[in-house]
Amino acid sequence: DKNEAPAEGAPPADAGAASTDGPTYLLVPMRGVIGEDVLADGLVSVIAFAKRSGVKHIVLEIDSPGGLASEGRRIGEIMRDARKEVTFTAYVKSALSAAVIPAISSHRIFYEPEAQIGAAVAYRWVPETGAAEVDEKFLSALAATMAAMAESSGLNGDIVRAMVIPRLAVYAWSTAGGDVVVSAESPPAGAKDARTVDDAKGVLTLTARQASDLRFGELVGEAGIDGLGERVDAPGWRLYSNYGETAMRRASSVQEEAQQARDRFESVASTLGALVRRAVSEDPHGRVKLYYEA
């Protein structure tokens, strides 16, 4: 079954299909919250399956409001380590907050017409106040990490920094040759088409059209994912199997079950603690012996 991973060391399902029937890809749905619905462990399984099956392309379908920055960074690191063996293509519907990371870690980004990307500012929970606050040091480190990820994919690092750090201005202008320059530095005097991309009043979010105009990815054509093969040097590519969806769903299910087990443990521990405290209060000198039967 091509939707299930072959055993380690065993011949992959449909081995050789990519070489005889043209290029193939695996589709990885990244829908929902990073760290809950979208987990790095699922992507690890998909990459391993792709390598064993001879699949060279992985398409990340991103439609996420964000989530845990730590899980997003782990996803980015996994992609970085595999990018010489697998080509990642981001198909973006919405990539906000931590969901920006898998997009900028891909070799290419393509946007649906109504897509958006950005707003990657991170907050930390402060138990003393019960509020979420911006941690400037963490943001600075995260911005540097994400900018490096973007630049390794040929994207502009200043755009990413503006998505992470509030109050960071970004400008754009055109050269005499028609190239678009995007920078945190002010445009030179007389620069052509000079404009402010982000006015430093908040974190940057780009529409699909804005991102395309700034060379921060490309717009998807009417053919959608099926039509992207021509643009990523895999003409006529086809979906190899549904294993990508299977793996991501399985990883999320495992985490949910683990969380339920932790919740049950905490509930039992709380109940036992209350019973012990009651027993101690009613028998402070420990005269009553307690026996437990298996």
Regions found by a protein language model. Give the residues of each.
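Glycine-rich beta-to-alpha active-site loop
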Residues: 64-75, 79-127, 134-138, 142-145, ...
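Compositionally biased, proline/threonine/alanine/serine-rich low-complexity intrinsically disordered stretches
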Residues: 1-24
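STAS-typified acidic loop motif
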Residues: 19-41
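A short, well-ordered alpha-helical element
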Residues: 36-56
